[in-house]
Amino acid sequence: QRQMCIRDRDNDERFDSIPVSTGQHKEMLEQVNTMFGITPKHDLGLMKPGQGLNEIVSRAIAGLDSIIEEEQPDVIISQGDTSTAMAAALAGFHRGVKIVHLEAGLRTGDIHSPFPEEANRKLIGQVAELHLAPTAGSMENLRRENVRSKDIVVTGNTVIDALLEAASWDTKFEDPALQ
């Protein structure tokens, strides 16, 4: 899903995208990035066995802060509801960079479920200047939180977009049952 957003920006001359990887699910991410032709410019290499959420978030903020200082982005697109997405939004906000939240407005109404994703969604939403909501329902959730209508755009679902893109490829499988 992130790959579609990055690839579309890469194909638009108005944007100079700077993909950053946290290192989470490295092998799976490499396969997907290869499929969509994406090479992260930075890899934070955050993931290590036995670390807790606070360590992940603090290391993410520190690593992203260095990248923000080096790259001087105009905008940070924080996608999803992971703790590293929240860390990216906070690091950018602390540096005065505009934050765009992709997949904004998803809500369960229970700050502890799912944990920590629901809290991450709300925290990102507090610092985002533009909220890209996947559905009209997500937009309504944001409106109930007093986000201005002019700051919300319903964009559709990035997972479905990526699935439709991949389904359109002329892929040959070795196993005839998959054709």
Q: Model-derived features: where do they sit?
A:
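Proline-aspartate-enriched helix->loop->beta-strand connector
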Residues: I68, Q72-D74
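Conserved nucleotide-sugar phosphate-binding/catalytic loop shared by glycosyltransferases and other
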Residues: E13-G63
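A nucleotide-sugar donor-handling region in carbohydrate enzymes
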Residues: V20-E27, V127-Q179
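An aromatic- and histidine-rich active-site surface loop
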Residues: I77-R95
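Short, small-residue-biased leader/transition segments that mark boundaries at the very start
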Residues: R2-I6
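Membrane-proximal helix-turn-helix segments that form the acceptor-binding/catalytic region
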Residues: E117-L130
